[in-house]
Amino acid sequence: MAIKVKCFASMREYLDLSEREIATDGIRNVADVWQSVAGEKPMPDNTLCAVNQNQADAKFSVSDGDEVAFFPPVTGG
């Protein structure tokens, strides 16, 4: 039973993490996933989250087999 976690751009550097699978024990939502991989590091206010490639917020429920991604806001010109 696992959730795949991916971090992109500055989130990858902030957490020193590209990709990891975590056990689903005690994981209910995106915020729990963040805490599992980040420990004491707070989630920056502008962090974007996605579950199975759909935008989600920290309260979004997750379950076994989900993919959760964290990335900074996208900018362009």
List PLM regions with ranges.
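Ubiquitin-like/PB1-type beta-grasp interaction modules and other compact soluble beta-rich domains
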Residues: 1-76
